Amino acid sequence: MKLDLKKDHNYQNGIYDFMAGTKSIVVANKEIDIEVDYAWDYASDPVITPTIIHEWKYLDKLVSKNVLKNARSILSIGGGGSSRTHEYLSPVTQEFTILNTGMWDLVNAQIPIETINTYLICATGEDMPILDSQIDAIEIPATLDHVIDARKVIEECYRVLNGGGKIGITLGNSDSWYRKVVSNLRIQVTSNHDHHHNFHFTSKDVENLLSEVGFTEVKTIGTAYLKLPKTIERKMKAPVLLAAHRFISNTMLRLLFGNSKGGMFLTYAMKPTAR
């Protein structure tokens, strides 16, 4: 993979740092702070239950199957930290790049086997220091709602992807059936993560964004349809219980509600090949 090394950067401890202490970017003539270091360890977060982690693993497998499979070069935007992408890489993968604005995530990134060239880049998704047409597959795992300019990030993805390359975006769904129920009942829900989210996407929002930028074959797979009280979810640790939860959540309830009403989703698409 070829980086744009003409951009100002430092290289230290295996990390290309293109941020140089930058803490904000300008969008529409307005300076907006960047999420520089979230430093979030989900294992110690009381909000995160075994069923949520199990749902994330299911999403990871969907990304591996529908986006990363047979890709020689992969870019993970917002990866690193506790991300498990390295476990799902294709046998043909030769290059794996993690791009994140947070140095903590890069320092703590899980690195794949030595036969895969790994690049760690501290930079924004809105201005990636990667030359055109370098990547076969891009994943944006639960990150697009944290960026400043979502459309610019998708445009940059389109630029660095090879023709025929794929992009996969995973997110929580603001239009899930159970969020609608909570809203209609006017139940107050507090979250210790809302202040980190700049957007609250639906799957349709992401589909439209990808299509507008030029991606084709846009598809969505809804997941995480079963939502139980936290007290119950915290007790569901046995593999048989988690397997039953996954079957109900991602098979039975998906058939009932359709692909756009799950609590999470994967939307993926392809950059068309040049004619």
Task: Indicate where each model-derived feature is located.
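Conserved class I S-adenosyl-L-methionine
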Residues: 5-69, 105, 112, 166-193
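A short glycine-rich, Lys/Arg-flanked "PGG" loop and its adjoining helix->strand segment in the class I
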Residues: 151-166
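A C-terminal cap/extension of S-adenosyl-L-methionine-dependent methyltransferases
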Residues: 182-186, 219-275
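A conserved beta-strand element that flanks and buttresses the S-adenosyl-L-methionine
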Residues: 139
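Class I SAM-dependent methyltransferase SAM/SAH-binding core
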Residues: 75-127
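Short catalytic micro-motifs in class I SAM-dependent methyltransferases
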Residues: 142-146
